[in-house]
């Protein structure tokens, strides 16, 4: 069925005009953006299929190739979908500029969307000023955290350059299990000692998963 064959009150554009944007489903919102379907399926059916098979969270992370596995989604529509989610990420980033850290949850929220590939471990250092506001962040390494590979010099070099009052380490666990490994604890201990010498406080080390986090500070693993 073509979109124009639907009852006017069921068409996304008309529903938008009558009831407002918040009344639309996720599939209807996406249909407004990519607009056209195929001879086999109208655009609303295509978007319902796309979201139904993936969910919004997974959809936001799909590659161009993965998006095009859905019938009716070609390169142009895949680019439109990726552009929408990229704008959403940038809005989130802009709202978190100079974010004040009061808890590990603040750091978890700040890091949303900043890990480019969740299938690999990424170690970041966040630089904070005297008000505990995040002034910048820096990607240190990609790969399994290991004390023999992570040198304090690499961590604190950027902190000195940014005139940081304190730093927070953040790294992700692709498995989703946020419990710290022995290597995580060893790296944290080494970096906390180095920070005390440089008088740059290691405020926290936070391990993130998909929907959870572990804070060394909140679990009293930092002095």
UniProtKB/Swiss-Prot annotation:
Q: Please provide the Gene Ontology terms (biological process) for this protein.
A: proteolysis
Q: Which PROSITE patterns match?
A: MPN, UPF0758
Keyword Isomerase in record = no
List residues binding Zn(2+): 171, 173, 184
Q: Which GO terms describe its molecular function?
A: metal ion binding; metallopeptidase activity
- The listed location of motif JAMM motif is 171-184
Q: Which InterPro entries match?
A: MPN (IPR037518), RadC_JAB (IPR025657), RuvA_2-like (IPR010994), UPF0758 (IPR001405), UPF0758_CS (IPR020891), UPF0758_N (IPR046778)
Which intervals hold domain MPN? 100-222
> Where do transmembrane segments lie in this chain?
none
Which Pfam families did the record assign?
A: RadC, UPF0758_N
Keywords assigned: Hydrolase, Metal-binding, Metalloprotease, Protease, Zinc
Name the family: Belongs to the UPF0758 family.
What is the protein name given in its UniProt record? UPF0758 protein Cphamn1_0831
């Amino acid at each position: 069925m073509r979109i124009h064959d639907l009852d006017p009150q069921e068409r996304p554009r008309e529903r938008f005009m009558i009831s407002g944007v918040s009344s639309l489903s996720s599939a209807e919102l996406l249909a407004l953006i990519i607009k056209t379907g195929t001879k086999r399926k109208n655009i609303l059916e295509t978007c319902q299929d796309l979201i139904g098979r993936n969910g919004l969270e997974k959809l936001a992370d799909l590659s161009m190739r993965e998006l095009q596995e859905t019938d009716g989604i070609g390169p142009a529509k895949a680019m439109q979908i990726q552009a929408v989610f990229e704008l959403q990420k940038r809005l989130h980033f802009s709202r978190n500029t100079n974010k004040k850290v009061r808890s590990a949850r603040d750091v978890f929220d700040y890091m949303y969307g900043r890990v480019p590939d969740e299938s690999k471990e990424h170690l970041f250092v966040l630089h904070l000023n005297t008000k505990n506001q995040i002034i910048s962040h820096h990607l240190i390494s990609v790969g399994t955290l290991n004390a023999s590979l992570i040198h304090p010099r690499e961590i604190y070099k950027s902190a000195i350059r940014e005139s940081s009052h304190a730093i927070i380490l953040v790294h992700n666990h692709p498995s989703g299990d946020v419990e710290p490994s022995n290597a995580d604890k060893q790296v944290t201990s080494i970096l906390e000692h180095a920070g005390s010498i440089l008088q740059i406080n290691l405020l926290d080390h936070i391990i993130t998963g998909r929907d959870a986090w572990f804070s060394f500070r909140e679990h009293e693993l930092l002095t």
